[in-house]
Amino acid sequence: MALHTRVLRLVLSGLMGALLVVSKQAMSGLPNLEPVSLLLILFALELPRETPGAITVFILLQGVLYGFGLWWVMYLYVWYLLALLAWLLHRMDNAFFWAVFSGLYGLCFGGLCAAVYLFAKTPAFALSWWLSGLSYDALHGIGNFVLMLLLYRPLRRALQMAKKQLRV
């Protein structure tokens, strides 16, 4: 791979990570409504080589902005897992499928995050933490579903056009 292509991919990863942070910040006033899941799924589908770098930038910047607490440890696996699952299902090109997938991931988000507490605290604590946040997980799932249903097709087309222009 030419040096130019490697540099372009590195810059893309950084820009994608920054976009994740900025878009999350822009919607931070809305409870559990975030575009990160939508964007990560689309990145994994259209720019799979750059996605791990983008996730790394996003996670590190979230730690810098909000502190590297126990919540941050959750981010070390939930976002990579989402990208991996999307990449494994990359042949699907159906907005409704991805809306359901994203909605279910949002619904399961608290359960996935609670896994940290299995090791950091106790299984009872992890279960109570997860159950106490189910209403937020429901909002997260609904928000993910709606955002994906509305924005999957136009954003995927935009990414495909950008890829052609950048020749990546």
Stretches with model-predicted labels:
Residues 21-34, 57-89, 117-121:
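Interfacial aromatic-anchored transmembrane helix boundaries in multi-pass membrane proteins
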Residues 2, 6, 14, 53-56, ...:
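Juxtamembrane loop-helix boundary motifs flanking transmembrane segments in multi-pass membrane proteins
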Residues 69-76, 94-168:
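Membrane-embedded alpha-helical hairpins and interfacial helices in multi-pass inner-membrane proteins
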Residues 1-42, 46, 50-54:
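Hydrophobic transmembrane alpha-helices
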Residues 52-63, 97-107:
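Central hydrophobic cores of alpha-helical transmembrane segments
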Residues 38-41, 63, 67, 83, ...:
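Hydrophobic transmembrane alpha-helices of multi-pass small-molecule transporters
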Residues 1, 45-48, 85-93, 153-160:
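Structural signal for the C-terminal ends of transmembrane alpha-helices
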